């Protein structure tokens, strides 16, 4: 019997990729980095979970850890500004959450994004989705290994006190789907 519905990423709740792509480009300009991500380029980079991980992978030796952190922080500031007026949830997600709750399922948000990003998304979606009643929310700070490692899902299962076969995960990238599958969760 299914006991929990685990939402695995921001992209399951709302479409933010374009806002994040623009925020990265703003950060690149602000830090004098001669990069510009068009839509196709940014979509390819989504194969690597985690903004700082993407920058590290793409920058190679060209960017220091401190530069990566600063660029990402500026990106986060620009992203926060773009979310200030709120955002719409993906079509059908509110209805899915309502039906899951009506069926007695516990809802979880199992992500390895930063607590700051979670707070921004929570606020931006607050007119549509109340994340305060989610049974579990994980972040990057809760695990040593980020997705595609299954640690975040294993933690969520532990916090919920359920087995992997009692949950269903919804993810929006192959890497993130791999995390759920690694933890033995249907996705």
Over which residues does each language-model region extend?
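N-terminal helical cap/lid subdomain that shapes the substrate entry/recognition surface
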Residues: 2-91, 102-103
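Substrate-recognition element of Asp-dependent hydrolases with the DxDx(T/V) motif
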Residues: 24, 93-124, 180
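Substrate-recognition "cap/lid" segment bordering the active-site pocket of phosphatases
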Residues: 114-168, 174-178, 182
């Amino acid at each position: 019997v299914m006991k929990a519905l685990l939402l695995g990423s921001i992209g399951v709740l709302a479409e933010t990729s374009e806002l994040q792509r623009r925020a990265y480009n703003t950060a690149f300009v602000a830090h004098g980095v001669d990069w510009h991500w068009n839509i196709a380029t940014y979509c390819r980079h989504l194969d690597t979970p985690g903004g700082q991980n993407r920058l590290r992978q793409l920058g190679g030796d060209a960017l220091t850890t401190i530069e990566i952190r600063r660029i990402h922080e500026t990106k986060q500031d620009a992203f926060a500004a773009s979310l200030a007026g709120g955002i719409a949830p993906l079509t059908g997600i509110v209805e899915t959450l309502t039906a899951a709750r009506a069926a007695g399922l516990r809802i979880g948000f199992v992500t390895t994004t930063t607590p700051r990003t979670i707070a921004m998304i929570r606020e931006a979606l607050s007119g549509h989705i109340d994340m305060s009643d989610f049974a579990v929310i994980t972040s990057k700070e809760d695990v040593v290994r980020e997705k595609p490692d299954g640690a975040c899902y294993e933690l969520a299962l532990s916090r919920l006190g359920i087995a992997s076969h009692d949950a269903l995960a919804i993810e929006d990238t192959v890497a993130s789907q791999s995390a759920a599958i690694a933890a033995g969760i249907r996705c």
